Amino acid sequence: MTDPPAVPEPSAGLSREQAERLRDSFDPEERERIERTVADLLDLLGKTDAMAVLSEFAFAEGSLRFSDLEADLDAAPNTLSTRLRELTEAGLLDREAFDEIPPRVEYTPTPKAEALFPVFAHLHHWAIDHDL
């Protein structure tokens, strides 16, 4: 088997043909793993407010607290809490609790989440020219 083509950065964008060639370059086992990961990611990001939460981190500088997200998003507190837990469990956010009174918890995007941030930039760029 030949080596798969170099994977361009997500911000570079791929034509349909390039994406197909890249996908087809993997052995069936690896291709199945990749497609399963994409499906799992889409399931997670398709949940209420998950995209909005990650988008906040994509354009934020540094950590965010629950209260920051609650102030910026029109999300129910219980939904926001659930999404933060799920995003943390998925390895997209780190949660740090500080031993203070009142208690303070901060969330920070992981490198795994930061690798998705160009996608949010593309979505915002797309929205400049398109409405739904």
Task: Give the role of each language-model region.
Residues 41, 50-56, 83, 115, ...:
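Residue-level recognition of specific faces of alpha-helices
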Residues 1-45:
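N-terminal leader segment of winged-helix/HTH proteins
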Residues 34-76, 106:
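N-terminal helix-turn-helix DNA-binding core of bacterial DNA-binding proteins
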